[in-house]
């Protein structure tokens, strides 16, 4: 305990390491972190002095430069936080190897197969002129805050290629090929003890003295597959700004939706929503550290601090919560949105829960999804589904089917269906309370109606119309067809003059048929009362 206090006062113990060598964790002596950290201009104490807040402690080996001496001068409270500008960025997902067959006739001694060579390709974005160089089996050193790489042999260093500013540029250098037959198996991966990186891609900004000390570094390793082929996998990325090295870490839960060409169509139905995983309403804007899951809104994150200390995604304990908020300048164009998006429209509601005091004047907060991908227009090829109230019957399908005797007698089973027609010609949801009230009113009206109005006692051979049902004589009839309609003749005539009529078919009695609008002609014989 006393040694820790003494280190806080006297400073960090000097480490026996060369000034230009890369720093490795854990140190031989002393501590890397202190008992507190600064974030957003505020000071926070941590119960884990040697815990890396943005990842695992072993990730510090990719940082390279030595830690800052402590204690150091803290910025004033009124001094604003300086925003770092990244002038160049290499898209690590686009890093790949391209196979080339050796043009020479030389083949390996052990096998007669032709030798296969590989070159490196990737995409990058830059806001300034940049010079890109590839290094294989390289060592890392630091001089005046800049990373300097040197390979084991000059043949493992590519020529420097210069590019102008632009986005989505393709790096391809077929003249620099890698022959893995000359590599040992242990040289394909990163060796922490030796400090040798299998592949280093260094992009140095070369656009005048104003941007001196800016660079982007991509560290990668190689993998050998069962079939003998090789692939490259990114390890870490570093951004050097004003001769200070920063380690880039991924944020899980936010991605560039515009760069989805490489993904299969099976991922189209995956969960790409940007709502909070707890409340499922507000947009997610809070990052959980050190797992780096962006899955909470500000309100749910504040509640989670006092209820639990585990991430809702990976269930690992978290040590800090970081709210990330994007802002943009208020312009006349932002007042009239080009299109409407249900997800992005929640940003206006989300701002009500956020603290507006930290927003600079003249700016407005926007969602991270909109800041990364912009406003996505709604596809016109997918029409919106109409509501129940918007569906109207045009009457072109024939005469409407009127109520049968079973419905007139108040059988509620005949009124049930997936969609019931309302008096105004619209279809409402079966579970709608309005539909239930209409059914009850209709049943009460039908129960009060006289049974004589259902069907007259005598049906003449001529055409008669009874409640919208046309009676036509002389058509063949079948009892099986009447059963298929779900309506029996006895139910129609059971209340005629309060007497029950028999259903015995008589050849002398005229028959009346009930015709329904359908693709086939259905008829039902009814004996005259």
Curated annotation (Swiss-Prot):
Question: Which keywords appear in this protein's UniProt record, sorted alphabetically?
Answer: Metal-binding, Transferase, Ubl conjugation, Ubl conjugation pathway, Zinc, Zinc-finger
**What's the Enzyme Commission number for this chain?**
2.3.2.27
Q: Which stretches does the entry tag as region Disordered?
A: 341-362, 396-529
Modification note:
Autoubiquitinated in vitro.
Recorded catalytic activity of this chain's protein:
S-ubiquitinyl-[E2 ubiquitin-conjugating enzyme]-L-cysteine + [acceptor protein]-L-lysine = [E2 ubiquitin-conjugating enzyme]-L-cysteine + N(6)-ubiquitinyl-[acceptor protein]-L-lysine
Q: Where is the composition biased (Low complexity)?
A: 501-511
Read off the domain note. Answer: The RING finger is required for ubiquitin ligase activity.
What this chain does, per the entry, is described as: E3 ubiquitin-protein ligase. Also acts as a negative regulator of hedgehog signaling.
Q: From the Swiss-Prot or TrEMBL record, give the protein name.
A: Probable E3 ubiquitin-protein ligase MGRN1
- Organism, as annotated: Danio rerio
Gene name of the record: mgrn1
């Amino acid at each position: 305990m006393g040694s820790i206090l003494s280190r806080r006062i006297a400073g960090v113990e000097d480490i026996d390491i060369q000034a230009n060598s890369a720093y490795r964790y854990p140190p031989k002596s002393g501590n890397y972190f202190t008992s507190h950290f600064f974030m957003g201009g505020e000071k926070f104490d941590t119960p884990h002095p040697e815990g890396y807040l943005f990842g695992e402690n072993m990730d510090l080996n990719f940082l390279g430069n030595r830690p800052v001496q402590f204690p150091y001068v803290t910025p004033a409270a009124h001094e604003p936080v300086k925003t770092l500008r990244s002038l160049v960025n290499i898209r690590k997902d686009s890093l790949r190897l391209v196979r080339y067959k050796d043009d020479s006739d030389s083949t390996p001694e052990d096998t007669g197969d032709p030798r296969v060579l590989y070159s490196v390709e990737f995409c990058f974005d830059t806001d300034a002129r940049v010079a890109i160089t590839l290094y294989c089996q390289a060592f890392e050193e630091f001089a005046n805050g800049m990373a300097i790489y040197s390979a084991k042999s000059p043949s493992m260093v590519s020529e420097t290629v210069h590019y102008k500013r632009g986005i989505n540029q393709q790096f391809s250098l077929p003249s620099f090929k890698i022959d893995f037959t000359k590599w040992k198996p242990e040289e394909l991966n990163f060796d922490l003890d030796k400090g040798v990186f299998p592949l280093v891609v260094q992009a140095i900004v070369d656009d005048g003295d104003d941007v001196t000390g800016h660079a982007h570094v991509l560290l990668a390793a190689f993998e050998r597959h069962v079939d003998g082929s090789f692939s490259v996998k990114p390890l870490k990325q570093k951004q050097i700004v004003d001769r200070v090295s920063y380690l880039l870490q991924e944020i899980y839960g936010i991605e560039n939706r515009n760069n989805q060409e490489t993904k299969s169509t099976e991922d189209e139905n995956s969960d790409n929503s940007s709502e909070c995983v707890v409340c499922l309403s507000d947009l997610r804007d809070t990052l959980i550290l050190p797992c780096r899951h962006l899955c909470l809104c500000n309100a749910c994150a504040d509640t989670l601090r006092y209820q639990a200390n585990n991430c809702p995604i990976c269930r690992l304990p978290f040590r800090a919560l970081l709210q990330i908020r994007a802002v943009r300048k208020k312009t006349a164009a932002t007042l009239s949105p080009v299109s409407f998006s249900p997800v992005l429209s929640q940003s206006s509601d989300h701002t009500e829960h956020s603290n507006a005091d930290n927003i600079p004047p003249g700016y407005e907060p926007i969602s991270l999804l909109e800041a990364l991908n912009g406003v996505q227009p709604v596809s016109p090829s997918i029409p919106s589904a109409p509501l129940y109230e918007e569906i109207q019957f045009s009457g072109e399908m024939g005469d409407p089917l009127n109520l049968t005797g079973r419905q007139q007698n108040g059988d509620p089973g005949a009124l049930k269906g997936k969609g019931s027609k309302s008096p105004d010609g619209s279809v409402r949801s079966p579970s709608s309370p309005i539909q239930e009230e209409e059914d009850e009113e209709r049943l009460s009206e039908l129960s009060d109606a006289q049974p004589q109005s259902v069907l007259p006692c005598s049906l003449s051979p001529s055409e008669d119309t009874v409640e919208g049902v046309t009676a036509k004589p002389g058509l063949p009839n079948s009892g099986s067809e009447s059963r298929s309609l779900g309506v029996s003749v006895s139910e129609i005539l059971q209340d005629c003059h309060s007497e029950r009529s028999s259903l015995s078919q008589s050849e002398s009695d005229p028959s009346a048929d009930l015709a329904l609008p359908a693709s086939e002609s259905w008829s039902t014989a009814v004996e005259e009362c």
